[in-house]
From Swiss-Prot:
<feature type="binding site">
    <location>
        <position position="178"/>
    </location>
    <ligand>
        <name>Zn(2+)</name>
    </ligand>
</feature>
<dbReference type="Pfam" id="PF04002">
    <property type="entry name" value="RadC"/>
</dbReference>
<protein>
    <recommendedName>
        <fullName>UPF0758 protein CPE2144</fullName>
    </recommendedName>
</protein>
<keyword id="KW-0482">Metalloprotease</keyword>
<dbReference type="GO" id="GO:0006508">
    <property type="term" value="P:proteolysis"/>
</dbReference>
<dbReference type="InterPro" id="IPR010994">
    <property type="entry name" value="RuvA_2-like"/>
</dbReference>
<keyword id="KW-0378">Hydrolase</keyword>
<feature type="domain" description="MPN">
    <location>
        <begin position="105"/>
        <end position="227"/>
    </location>
</feature>
<feature type="short sequence motif" description="JAMM motif">
    <location>
        <begin position="176"/>
        <end position="189"/>
    </location>
</feature>
<dbReference type="InterPro" id="IPR037518">
    <property type="entry name" value="MPN"/>
</dbReference>
<dbReference type="Pfam" id="PF20582">
    <property type="entry name" value="UPF0758_N"/>
</dbReference>
<keyword id="KW-0479">Metal-binding</keyword>
<feature type="binding site">
    <location>
        <position position="176"/>
    </location>
    <ligand>
        <name>Zn(2+)</name>
    </ligand>
</feature>
<keyword id="KW-0645">Protease</keyword>
<dbReference type="InterPro" id="IPR046778">
    <property type="entry name" value="UPF0758_N"/>
</dbReference>
<dbReference type="GO" id="GO:0046872">
    <property type="term" value="F:metal ion binding"/>
</dbReference>
<feature type="binding site">
    <location>
        <position position="189"/>
    </location>
    <ligand>
        <name>Zn(2+)</name>
    </ligand>
</feature>
Amino acid sequence: MSKNIRINEIPSGERPREKLLFYGAQFLSNEELLAIILRTGNKDSNVVELSYRIIHSVGGLNGLFKASAKELMEVKGVKEAKATQILAMCELYKRFKVSELTQVKISKPSDVAKLVLDELRMLRQEVLILINLDTKNKVISKKEIFKGGLNSSLVHPREIFREAVKDSAASIIICHNHPSGDPTPSRDDINITTRLKECGKMMGIELLDHLIIGDNRFISLKEKDIL
């Protein structure tokens, strides 16, 4: 097969688009759903086979939503056009999730963990997330503030509270991950928390909690009486 294979050229029993219309999207595999987005395969693979290769090359759905264009194009059969299709799909999903945030009210650390655990637990580098809250503890926004090795000399309260003021936050929560999988707070974690707590008092924007995310688990510094 020297030409790109389109969905309507795949045997009827294997056509993801037709299966979706007949059975519903919930009955399709991840690979079949991605195949509908990509539309075509290549000379070596039909579109479902290509979708399987992509998803499994980047580490499943979690990896797919974190993959860069460069990482996607390292998969055999994926060039710029297909990489941008995937990135656009992932960005739409992320924006949808952000729009849902305004419906979330925070009453306990596990509420916060639900917002960030899946996003942070598998990352290979440290990332700090800021969650801005209104006077009723409803989420206003969730923003990535720092990426890379975090320590108390690099994390400046100015960057965090600038975003809090911009969103008219009444209070904030910060979250970051430990790539090691162990969420035990380090000395730097405690120092950062103390600095942010003091700055928050001066600015009238309370730091409610600092969550550290590990491998499918988390620690709340508020629950540990560190905050």
